Regions:
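Carbohydrate-interacting/catalytic domains
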Residues: 1-173, 208-216, 453, 458, ...
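Alpha-amylase-like alpha-glycosidases and glucanotransferases acting on alpha-linked glucans and related
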Residues: 182-318, 344-571, 596-618, 624, ...
Length: 711
């Protein structure tokens, strides 16, 4: 590659090579580098253009203040001269050649050397998360006597209140991000129209003030619209019913002040326009491509009732999420509800329209080739432009975090490595023909820490896959948790790692939404369905043999750790009683299959006993695992071939509360992780005890695994 192009790419944070999952150096094609530089507004299409752009990059005064300064509390920073800090609270501080280490946390302004820049003072670290356990929940999968064909925020409040009374410390949700209002309704929560607003599909119609205020005849019409639960969740049917019901109730609601929240007004305007023109703003008439365009104002006036309606839906979402937070707080949950932040957005959605100035237009975020995805992955998501974020004081990033965290006791950040770098695929290129673009990780992580600190929230980064060591170190240094998954906790020879060696600085789980459930793994369902969908890269017999070997490796680890009870016959032959696994699992005698194989139910309990035996700060339990569901929520590599994000749980909220298998797991984990008397209620900030910081060395972590696919 031309040296000038390499230097230009380096100056703008664009990688010209990367290390693949086999730790081999891979050179990026020059045309990819040129294409990605173009997405950053840098012309590199000719030698002359490269020379001009490189000269401009080298002419930048490196001693000048950047547009945004992110300073960690307790640290100082040299300045080019005297200045004044205008504090967030209205105060002012004169500074002379250096930013002092005692500035308060927050968003300030610095005037120095003839410039005014944003100054963000961020915490060194968050308080250490409590040692507790909780449920991982795909909210759409819940059902109850009052929900309409899918789980809703009323179900979540009920479930959270019950979980808190049984000793759970958290409930981790799928993303509740907004999707487009036009049909077909998007099922994937990881490709949202907006990460700043909530999907009104999750509203409980009967819990709204407008329903209570409506006359009996209107309520009867609304009640008759309720769809029944089906074998699969039909988002279009649910949205059609709920939208009609809420339209009937809207006249009974007080008006929403759109001037109080310009971002909400713009989002509601996008929703109204999307109903008229479709969910992808890029296909709208050109005069509607910018929120401030005169044609947008004209059509918003024509659609004033629809704009008001969609703004009202967001107010309802806020009210019902507040009720969920109250349910967690009332039971003393030390963490509470943990929301999930998707790695990106649908570029044609509301955020792509409203935040276009800070997004790289035309880029598609994905992942490079790996052992599981040899052609790479194209998630079709938009990406922040790192230069524009800095130029605008990270305002869009901050506001996104604030809107999510105001209802959260914790935040899971999907693909947290994206705060360091993202795989950009330029227009016209295949998923493997992208490259990494670097972000200011200190700024991204620091601002996340500041907003989480203010919300009293814990942070969990999804750092599975081939992530750089800097990611794990960065999370640990700020008391943010990583992720560990039993399936990936392996030694180099493929043996499962004993739970005592799992990382302390982590949320530990058996599986994820992209992987087989515990019952599905034990029965080989993951092989059967992938064979049926033509997703296997090898012969099905080979895959079955691998799955059987993996099962035996798992059983060997559970037996070695005395977590799996032996059968009575096996114990008698060994000259002793059934072993100690019964204690951990709460069942002294093991059921067995023909041939002495342990019962799958006992194995699932033992797998949860492994979670309980780990040093990991947080433990996450999936209802799919505990209720015996063999189908996984999402099958990477499929769209319509598999019912992704549409599988209801096999039990209702009421049935979950009395299910013997659920009770067994609750008893096991509550005994292993009893509530600490000093735990802070959900939504408040606890103070870490001395020596309780997470920056110390963790036990051995898990083997690097490829990035999980995203549908």
């Amino acid at each position: 590659m031309d040296r000038g192009l390499v230097a230009l790419a380096t100056a703008h944070g664009v990688s010209t090579w990367y290390e693949d999952w086999r730790h081999r150096r891979v050179e990026v094609a020059p045309e990819t580098v040129v294409g990605v530089l173009g997405l950053l507004g840098v012309d590199a299409t000719s030698p002359a253009a490269i020379a001009d752009a490189l000269a401009a990059a080298r002419a930048v005064d490196r001693t000048a203040l950047p547009p945004t300064v992110v300073l960690t509390e307790g640290r100082t920073r040299a300045l080019p001269g005297p200045g004044v800090v205008s504090l967030e609270d209205g105060g002012r501080r004169a500074v002379d050649g250096e930013l002092p280490g005692d500035l308060p946390l927050g968003w300030h302004h610095l005037t120095c050397d003839g410039r005014e820049v944003i100054l963000v003072v961020v915490p060194r670290r968050l308080p250490a998360p409590p040692r507790t356990w909780g449920w991982m929940l795909q909210l759409y999968s819940l059902t109850s006597a009052r929900s309409w064909g899918m789980g809703d925020l009323g179900d979540l409040a009920e479930f959270t209140g019950w979980a808190g009374t049984t000793g759970a410390g958290l409930v981790l949700l799928n993303p509740l991000h907004a999707v487009g209002p036009a049909h077909p309704v998007a099922a994937s929560p990881y490709s949202p129209a907006s990460r700043r607003f909530v999907n009104p599909l999750y509203l409980r119609v009967g819990d709204t003030g407008a329903y209570a205020a409506a006359d009996p005849a209107t309520r009867a019409v609304v009640d008759a619209l309720r769809p029944d639960r089906g074998d699969l969740i039909d988002y279009d049917e649910v949205w059609t019913a709920k939208r009609h019901a809420l339209e009937l109730l809207h006249p009974y609601a007080p008006p929403v002040d759109l001037d109080a929240d310009p971002a909400l007004r713009n989002f509601a305007t996008w929703c109204a326009l999307a109903e008229r023109h479709g969910n992808d703003w890029r296909a709208w008439p050109a005069e509607l491509h910018h929120p401030d365009a005169p044609a947008v104002a004209e059509q918003a006036g024509q659609l004033a009732d629809r704009v008001a309606f969609h703004a009202w839906l967001q107010h309802l979402c806020d009210e019902q999420l507040d009720a969920v937070t109250a349910a967690a707080r009332s039971t003393g949950m030390p963490v509470g509800v943990v929301h999930d932040l998707a790695v990106g957005i649908d570029p044609g959605g509301a955020d792509g329209w409203q935040l276009a100035d800070v997004l790289a237009q035309g880029v598609r975020v994905g992942a490079p080739p790996d052992d599981f995805n040899q052609l790479g992955q194209d998630w079709g998501l938009a990406a922040w432009r790192p230069d524009r974020l800095a130029e605008t004081g990270y305002a869009a990033y901050r506001d996104m975090l604030r809107r999510t965290l105001r209802h959260a006791g914790g935040l899971r950040v999907d693909h947290v490595a994206g705060l360091w770098r993202l795989w950009w695929v330029p227009p016209g290129a295949g998923a493997a023909e992208g490259t990494y673009v670097r972000y200011d990780a200190d700024a991204m992580l620091g601002i996340l820490a500041l907003e989480a600190h203010r919300a009293g929230a814990v942070v969990v980064g999804e750092d599975l896959g081939t992530v750089q060591p800097a990611v794990t170190r960065g999370l640990r240094g700020r008391n943010m948790l990583g992720s560990t998954v039993l399936w990936f906790a392996r030694d180099d020879d493929g043996a499962f790692t004993p739970p005592a060696r799992w990382p302390r600085n982590a949320l530990a789980t058996i599986s994820t939404h992209d992987l087989p459930t515990a019952p599905g793994f034990l029965t080989g369902e993951h092989v059967r369905v992938r064979d049926e969908l033509k997703l296997l890269g090898t012969d099905v017999a080979v895959e079955r043999a691998r799955a059987a070997a993996d099962r035996e490796r798992l059983l060997a680890m559970l037996r070695a750790e005395s977590l799996l009870p032996r059968s009575r016959d096996a114990a008698t032959e060994a000259g002793g009683p059934p072993d100690a696994a019964g204690k951990a699992a709460g069942r002294p005698d093991a059921a067995t299959k023909a041939g002495g194989e342990p019962d799958d139910g006992d194995v699932v309990v033992a797998m949860h006993a492994a979670l309980a035996a780990s040093p990991s700060r947080l433990l996450g339990v999936s209802l799919y695992d505990v209720l015996g569901e063999v189908r996984q929520p999402n099958m990477p590599g499929t769209v319509d071939e598999y019912p992704n994000w549409r599988l209801p749980l096999p039990a209702s909220v009421a049935q979950i509360r009395t299910d013997p298998g659920v009770t067994r797991i609750v008893d096991l984990l509550t005994a292993a992780r009893p509530r600490r008397a000093t735990a802070a209620p959900a939504g408040t900030t606890a103070t870490a005890a001395p020596g309780d910081m997470l920056a110390d060395a963790d036990p051995a972590g898990q083997r690097a695994t490829p990035d999980a696919g995203r549908a």
